[in-house]
């Protein structure tokens, strides 16, 4: 079955921002089916709306599906996976600047992280799990991403100077995401 990647953006972003178009283009060139989802109302996001959007793709998910999320997209897919009834594990999830608790500077997003997450269900939902975090992220503290990686038993990839991996910080490509994905792909073909 063909590898499939869904890229989920974060708060105040869209499918045309940051490193998302680069990753999609790179994956398509490799013959991987790749889509960047446009999440509703990214300037004033509501969890229910984002879960409804993710649910539209639920029937397309399979063992060769990988979810790549950035920032607010991370708790959104974690909530999605908590409630999803999968017949088989997804191939994997990669969470860039991921978090699973309230951000002190963005409390208007607390709806996405209120209450505890079902870490075991999330672990069981995806064969491979990775968190990519920057030591100098001013939006999502590195410790939040590190905690998330521990909670969901994910590999943690530390970047020294990545900020929040935004376009205005110079990130129109993010090779580490591509490299982690392709390492997972190669594990599946052995």
From Swiss-Prot:
One of its GO terms (molecular function) is hydrolase activity. InterPro entries: AB_hydrolase_fold (IPR029058), Hydrolase_RBBP9/YdeN (IPR010662), RBBP9 (IPR052581). The active site is at residues 71, 137, 164. Pfam families: Ser_hydrolase (PF06821). It comes from the Bacteria. Keywords: Hydrolase. Transmembrane segments: none annotated. Its EC number is 3.-.-.-. It is an enzyme of class 3 (hydrolase). Belongs to the RBBP9 family. This is Putative hydrolase YdeN. It comes from Bacillus subtilis (strain 168).
């Amino acid at each position: 079955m063909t590898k499939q990647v869904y890229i989920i953006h974060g708060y105040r972003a869209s499918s045309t921002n940051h490193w998302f178009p680069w990753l999609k283009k790179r994956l398509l060139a490799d013959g991987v089916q790749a889509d960047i989802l446009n999440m509703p109302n990214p300037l004033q996001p509501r969890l229910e709306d984002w879960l409804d959007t993710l649910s539209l793709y639920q029937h397309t998910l399979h063992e060769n599906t990988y979810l790549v999320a950035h920032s607010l997209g991370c708790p959104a897919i974690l909530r999605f996976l908590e409630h999803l009834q999968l017949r088989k594990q997804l191939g994997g999830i990669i969470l860039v600047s991921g978090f699973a608790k309230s951000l002190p500077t963005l409390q208007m997003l607390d709806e996405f992280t209120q209450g505890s997450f079902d870490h075991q269900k999330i672990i069981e939902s995806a064969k491979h799990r990775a968190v990519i975090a920057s030591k100098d992220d001013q939006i999502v503290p590195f410790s939040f991403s590190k905690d998330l990686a521990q909670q969901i038993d994910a590999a943690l990839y530390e970047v020294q100077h990545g900020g929040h991996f935004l376009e205005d910080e110079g990130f129109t490509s993010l090779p580490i995401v591509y490299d982690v994905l392709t390492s997972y792909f190669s594990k599946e073909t052995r």
